From Swiss-Prot:
Cited Pfam families: Ribosomal_L34e (PF01199)
Protein name, entry field: Large ribosomal subunit protein eL34
HAMAP family in UniProt: Ribosomal_eL34
InterPro entries: Ribosomal_eL34, Ribosomal_eL34_C_sf, Ribosomal_eL34_CS, Ribosomal_L34e_arc-type
GO MF term (any one): structural constituent of ribosome
Length: 85
């Protein structure tokens, strides 16, 4: 049985075939998915994905309205639509 730290599902399991023919399990951190815009689903620029605890709040996402939620082009469309109403 693996040690308790490796039983967590926050680590991904990679099954590796050894030269002897046996299968070993290697553990590594999961990679986070790229954040996407809520409207157009394009990848967001300027948003970090992994190890967010290492960064300050301003480094994790853009400092603008809806930063980290909408891309800049969708935000421009939204602002124009709100102004025109």
């Amino acid at each position: 049985m693996p040690r308790p730290a490796l039983r967590s599902r926050s680590l991904r399991r990679i099954y590796v075939k050894l030269p002897s023919g046996k299968t070993a399990i290697h553990y590594e951190r999961k990679k986070n998915d790229i954040p996407k815009c809520a409207m157009c689903k394009k990848p967001l620029h300027g948003v970090k994905t992994n190890f967010l605890h290492k960064y300050g709040k301003s480094e994790k996402r853009p400092e603008r309205p809806f930063g980290g939620y909408l891309c800049s082009s969708c935000l421009a469309q939204l602002i124009k639509a709100m102004v025109r109403q």
